[in-house]
Amino acid sequence: MPHWAAVIMAAGKGTRMKSKLPKVMHTLAGKPMLQHVLDCVRSVEIPRSMVVLGHGREQIEATLDDRTEVVVQEEQCGTGHAIMQAIPHCHEVDHIIVLSGDQPLIRPETLRNLVRIHIEHNAAATLLTACFENPHGLGRILKEGDQFLRVVEEKDATPEERLIQEINTGTYCFNVAKLREALKNITPKNAQGEYYLTDVFAVFHAQGEVIRTYCTEDVHEALGINSRAQLAAAEDVARQRILSYWMEEGVTIIDPRSTFIEAGVVLQPDVVLQPFTILKGRTQVAEDAVIGPHTTLTDCTVGAGSEVSHTVGNQAVIGGHCTIGPYAYLRPGTVLQDKVKVGDFVEIKNSQIGEGSKIPHLSYVGDSQVGKSVNIGAGTITCNYDGVNKYKTIIRDKAFLGSNTNLVAPVEIGEGSVTGAGSTISKNVPANTLAIERSTQKHIENWVRNKKK
């Protein structure tokens, strides 16, 4: 939409959150509230996004990308004052859409409808409204027929006006030229000395300007988040939206009540999510994979047909048709090629595991390069850290490591080689070689352990 801009108000302190973090930086479904609003605006192709910042400006600004323009509100003197700071930046902008950074449940289709009505009626202003069964504490929309009259705040409403269920959400479209003039006519008539943006509607009405409304069917879009309890309630709404979306896209979710998927996750059809699965960050799961139960993956990639059970993964790549778990721990830098098996109580860190290799149980593999068709026996440990530096272990294709092998890095095991159970290997092993390193077994005859009396 050319000649449009979005202005997102995010200057408030959020005192009720009782946090050192600015309110709009608290996360919902894995993303800051403000980012949800920015993403929504960009999905409807509004070319410019301005964020009005005040409290916590440095913290918020550090998270914004180059596409986002920052407008500074040095003193928080109300919503009208915030827009006054943004208007001088609206060069070659005919219309703006004003949103709140603490309303992350706004949807793209709602913004499209709001903009459409604004344009169709050549309105000076268009308000997004919602109908609440219990609108206590919210500003009411007064109309005569379908004609907007004004917004009445709860404290100023008559008993009859308080029965009105249609409320003001705080999201608006404005004609910039008309808004610029209207802002000159509002004054701070309250004890706080604040300029209220809603006062411009009275100015427009007095001038005979067109003011329209659009009532969203989803009341959750109107929810502003001002407390931890409200954040938790919004999290539940966002989670249900995400789960419903992926089920519509062909993902099987066995128990939605115990499944958590963040907004940045991507799933393909025929993925199955077992109970108590948590998918976070930029995790991607390919078709026919089965995740869970009791699995948490953060910024991981899972290939087609893989099974991941009772596992924690962070920044790991899992190839196709792998079997992971139960009780595996995949740390950052782990790359598993196709058909790899990682069994119970195995930890892998910063290592590449070749196709068809197996690490069945009770092992630690760190800073290692493992070839194809390698078998790593139970209890094998790569000793990669000397207290100062980390060192690399290389295990070539088709090597077989006996149980309880210790590999003291830097060390290389040649292709097709075997290590004897219980060996501590500190020197390179050539290809097709058996390496055994053991202490001599001793028998002490006629020895009887002293017993406690």
UniProtKB/Swiss-Prot annotation:
Cofactor note: Binds 1 Mg(2+) ion per subunit.
Keywords carried by this UniProt record: Acyltransferase, Cell shape, Cell wall biogenesis/degradation, Cytoplasm, Magnesium, Metal-binding, Multifunctional enzyme, Nucleotidyltransferase, Peptidoglycan synthesis, Repeat, Transferase
EC number: 2.7.7.23, 2.3.1.157
GO annotation, biological process: cell morphogenesis; cell wall organization; lipid A biosynthetic process; peptidoglycan biosynthetic process; regulation of cell shape; UDP-N-acetylglucosamine biosynthetic process
InterPro entries with a match to the protein in the record: Bifunctional_GlmU, GlmU-like, GlmU_C_LbH, Hexapep, MobA-like_NTP_Trfase, Nucleotide-diphossugar_trans, Trimer_LpxA-like_sf
Record's subcellular location: Cytoplasm
Broad class of the protein's primary localization: cytoplasm
Positions bound to UDP-N-acetyl-alpha-D-glucosamine: 23, 73, 78-79, 100-102, 139, 153, 168, 226, 331, 349, 364, 375
Pathway: Nucleotide-sugar biosynthesis; UDP-N-acetyl-alpha-D-glucosamine biosynthesis; N-acetyl-alpha-D-glucosamine 1-phosphate from alpha-D-glucosamine 6-phosphate (route II): step 2/2; Nucleotide-sugar biosynthesis; UDP-N-acetyl-alpha-D-glucosamine biosynthesis; UDP-N-acetyl-alpha-D-glucosamine from N-acetyl-alpha-D-glucosamine 1-phosphate: step 1/1; Bacterial outer membrane biogenesis; LPS lipid A biosynthesis
One Pfam entry name: NTP_transf_3
CDD domains: GT2_GlmU_N_bac, LbH_GlmU_C
Region Pyrophosphorylase, annotated ranges: 1-228
Region: N-acetyltransferase, residue numbers: 250-453
Record field: catalytic activity: alpha-D-glucosamine 1-phosphate + acetyl-CoA = N-acetyl-alpha-D-glucosamine 1-phosphate + CoA + H(+); N-acetyl-alpha-D-glucosamine 1-phosphate + UTP + H(+) = UDP-N-acetyl-alpha-D-glucosamine + diphosphate
First-level EC class: transferase
Function, as annotated: Catalyzes the last two sequential reactions in the de novo biosynthetic pathway for UDP-N-acetylglucosamine (UDP-GlcNAc). The C-terminal domain catalyzes the transfer of acetyl group from acetyl coenzyme A to glucosamine-1-phosphate (GlcN-1-P) to produce N-acetylglucosamine-1-phosphate (GlcNAc-1-P), which is converted into UDP-GlcNAc by the transfer of uridine 5-monophosphate (from uridine 5-triphosphate), a reaction catalyzed by the N-terminal domain.
UniProt similarity note: In the N-terminal section; belongs to the N-acetylglucosamine-1-phosphate uridyltransferase family.
Subunit structure: Homotrimer.
Name of the protein in question: Bifunctional protein GlmU
Organism: Desulfitobacterium hafniense (strain DSM 10664 / DCB-2)
